[in-house]
Structure formats: C-alpha cells, structure tokens
Amino acid sequence: MDGFSNQNTRFKTLVYNANRDALKLAPDKPIFSKTPFSAILPLRRRKLNTPSSLIIGGGIVGLATARQLLRQHPGADVTVLEKEAVPGQHQTAHNSGVLHCGLYYTPGSLKARLAVEGIREMAEFCDEHKVPHEICGKLVVATNDAEVPRMDKLFERGQANGLEGIEKLNRDQMHEIEPHVGGVAALKVPQEGIVDYIAVTAALVKNIEKMGGKVILNARATRFHEGSEWTVETPAGDFSADWIINCAGLHCDRVSQLAGQKRDLRIVPFRGEYYRLKPESRHLVNHLIYPVPDPAFPFLGVHFTRLISGGIEAGPNAVLAFAREGYRKTNLNVRDLFDALTYVGLWRFALKYPKMCVNELRGSFSKKYFSKQLQKLVPEIQPSDLETGGAGVRAQAMSPEGGLVQDFHFARGTRALHVLNAPSPAATASLAIGTEIINQLELN
C-alpha cells in the first residue's frame, strides 16, 4: 500500500500559504471555487449532445480524473464535489508517498498496467509542476532461503510487467546498497520512488481550475436524483450533470448505494500504523526496503519507507479501524463499526486468517513486537530506535466470501461509473486511472 502519514496541517499550509509561489498560484485567484460552471464535455464526439460530469470525491483519484477529462476534452463541464474543507484529506493526506512501479501485481491486471503507466505519468507531472519527488530505488529482501523461490517468481513477474533494470543480488551485493539489511538475497528495483502527494494534490487543483474546472468544497453528496440528468444534493447546493463519477474512496460503496447501485462489495476499513526511525537511527536505511510477499497472507507486511521530507517510516500493520476515518485507536464511529461487524465478509475473513489478525493487533499495542517484525529486514533495529509515526486507513473492498478485492474495481451504472476498489497503488496510478475511467465512460 501507499503508506500512511498524517500531513493535514502541512497540506493546508502548502495550499493556502507557503507554496503559492512555488506552485505559481496567482494570489488574486482563489485556489478552490465555490460555484459550478457550464460547458460541454465531448465524451463521444459523434454525439450531438455531449455530457457534463460531476466527480464525487476530491482525493487524488477524483482530482486526477477531472484533470484528465479536461485535458482530453478542453472546455468540458467538469465539477468535483469534495465533502471536506480541503481536498485530499484522507487517503491522499495520510500517505507516505511511495511511487510504486508495478512489481507486485499480477501481469495483465489493472494494477499492473496502470502502475507501470501511472508512475511514468506521475513523474512527468511532478517534473512539469515542480513537485518534490525522487526515484530512489527499492530492495525486496529474501530474509531466508525459503523466500528465495518466491523472490525469483517476483523477479519474473516484474519482467512480465515490463520493468527494466531489475536485478537479483546476492548477500554481498545487497550489503553494498544497504549495509544494515538482513537476509540472504534481494531484488534491486531501480524504478521505485517517493513523492509529496500533498503537493501533487495542490498542483492538480491548480491545473483543474486553470482549464476551467471547479472544485467545490464542503459539498458532501447526501442524495442523488436520476432524471434526464443527475442531480446531487449537498450542503453547498444542488449540482446537476449528465454523468456522475464516484471517486469517494473510503465511502465509495455508500455513494454507489445512494446512486442506486446494489452494494455487492463493502469497504472494510483497515488502519495501518507506522513508527518512525529516530534521527540518530536513520543511517540504518538508505532506500526503500520491502519484504518478499507471503502468498498465504493478504497484506504485504512491514517495511521501511524513505520520506521525501527526509525521515524514515517503518510499518504498517493492518488492524480493523472502528471508523472509516479512524486514524487513531480511540476514534469510533458507531455507524462505521456496525457496518463492518454486521458484514458476513469480515467474519469469514477473520476465520481465514485468525493468527494474522491476532498478530497484527499485537503490533498495534506492542512496540517490542512491532520491532521484532522489522528486525527480519534490519536486524539492528531496536524498540528504542522507534518513535510513534502516522497512520491511515485503507479503502479496501471486501467480498461477501471474505476475500480482499485484489485489483482495481469499477462498476458501471446508468450514466455513472463507480470506483469501488482503489487501494495502493492508486495514488501512483491516479493519472492513469483517470484515463481508464474516461475510456470506460466512452465505451459505455
């Protein structure tokens, strides 16, 4: 997953104050507009009447989709409805900022294709808009001999996904890159990187408004009416358009249900918690250090992530959150918790992975246990090297059978498209996801 780290305050500072000049935002023009606009969206050029679009959700996927629509169809009527006072406050703002190159994903899947396309597009976007980013590379470490065959299969998967330059390293070669890492072998993945997704979000908003689009804040979608066009009720007013595109992230299943879709999948919120290495311990990690995935478990496991700001994060675990926006252990939303605990899929998931669920919970309350998991990658790590970091919540779709939906998942409705599963690597792939959404709309 793209990791988690709470950066909401920094985002507000970035958008409203510090980086106006860096992002070339005109001081006399508001970054976020309060009113919609009208234009024509030529999704199918052969049609006489081309549709306007409302995008529900102003996270990085919703904003990237709006930007791609406006780039492909200049002058289009595109409005983003965001429920918060600042865009991108949830998954986007609680993101450690990894640029995923597509190594882990099944060849031919949407995740594989869109991650490979998306990292290239995101790097180009960052270059164009002067967004801080770095292609720093990653090591995927086999911690024992039993993991080497899985590492070899991962190497083959990376090649199948079109990744160039990945290498198998023996122990000595591995230690030349990461002297403190444990294990017996590793994959060197040069394409992987890090980025400031908060700055990406601010640049996307500027780009959208420059092209004539609108981002409406404090506009939670509360009701949907389908007639000759869609009308969406929000506290900021009612908005109408021919098409709706649901990019509501943690609430995408509920938004789709409001719009008349059957809720076949459900978002089950898993909180990922991080520690950070103390400044005096950061020398232990030079790059991104990841484990070889265990196919017996649905989550990747803890790893080390360099931050574009200079720190090192370690984690995450994966525990059930008691609120869809529950970034702290004490956060509780009765509706969200009831929604999760009454879902048969969650209980079937827990029965499939009882030991994993217990261990993930142990890591949430025990720094000593958490550090033991990290020691598999960097044996020198001690609990004293760690300080509490950020956390975030995955918008992970789960089936009634208790399986995590492994690929990006879109559902079509009447003049509607719903993004119902977009966890990692969705931030990396957001621009490519936007293009994919447009392609699906044009085929509908």
Question: What residues fall within each predicted segment?
Answer:
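Beta1/beta-strand and adjacent pyrophosphate-binding region of the FAD-binding site
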Residues: 48-61
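Flavin-dependent oxidoreductases
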Residues: 64, 224-333
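Glycine-rich FAD pyrophosphate-binding loop
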Residues: 70-92
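Dinucleotide-binding Rossmann-like beta1-alpha1 core, especially the glycine-rich loop
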Residues: 97-173, 183, 301-302, 313, ...
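Short beta-strand to alpha-helix junction loop
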Residues: 106-117, 141-150, 188-207, 361-366, ...
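Helical element adjacent to the flavin cofactor pocket in flavoenzyme catalytic cores
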Residues: 187-242, 431, 435-440
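Flavin-binding catalytic cores
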Residues: 262-264, 281, 307-309, 314-391
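C-terminal catalytic lobe of FAD-dependent flavoproteins
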Residues: 349-444
